[in-house]
């Protein structure tokens, strides 16, 4: 890996619930992609209204244990938030591109191997 220099850039952010608060599209959101280096849980907390209002919502997100923990999130709480909001969670198998229900996957192995996986979370209708 060698010596790598990283530059940090501060950017403004806004919660999606706030951004869409007066929008006629707030209940017409059907897809969200998140790859925000461990801040996914914080983003979900800022879109609880969107999660509740949009019955056809699908979210594609990374699940990276170390990144979540570095951001102060318990990975189990991240998954629980999806389940509490009535989402089915699938792991995207990178080799076959199949969707595997999360209950068929050994999450503890993913955690111990420190893997980064992609999840497809689809609202149950």
Regions found by a protein language model. Give the residues of each.
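Non-catalytic surface loops within mature trypsin-like serine protease
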Residues: 38, 63-65, 123-125
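Structural detector for hydrophobic anchor residues on beta-strands
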Residues: 9-11, 59, 119
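Short beta-strand segments
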Residues: 30-34, 60-62, 120-122
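Conserved beta-strand termini and adjacent loop/short-helix elements that scaffold enzyme active sites
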Residues: 14, 62, 92-94
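Rossmann-like AdoMet/SAM-dependent catalytic core
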Residues: 2-3, 7, 69-125
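Proline-centered loop/turn at the N-terminus of a beta-strand
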Residues: 56-58, 88
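Amphipathic, alpha-helical segments enriched in basic
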Residues: 22, 57, 64, 95-97, ...
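Short internal loop-to-helix segment that lines adenine-nucleotide cofactor pockets
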Residues: 1-54, 67-73, 77
């Amino acid at each position: 890996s060698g010596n790598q220099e990283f530059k940090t850039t501060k950017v403004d952010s806004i919660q999606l619930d706030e951004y869409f608060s007066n929008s006629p599209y707030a209940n017409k959101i059907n897809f969200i992609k998140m790859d925000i280096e461990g801040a996914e849980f914080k983003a979900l907390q800022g879109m609880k209204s969107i999660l509740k209002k949009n019955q056809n919502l699908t979210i594609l997100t990374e699940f990276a244990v170390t990144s979540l923990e570095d951001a102060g999130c318990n990975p189990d709480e991240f998954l629980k938030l999806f389940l509490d909001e009535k989402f089915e969670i699938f792991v995207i198998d990178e080799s076959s591109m199949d969707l595997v229900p999360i209950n068929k996957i050994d999450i503890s192995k993913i955690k111990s191997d420190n893997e980064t996986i992609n999840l497809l979370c689809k609202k149950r209708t």
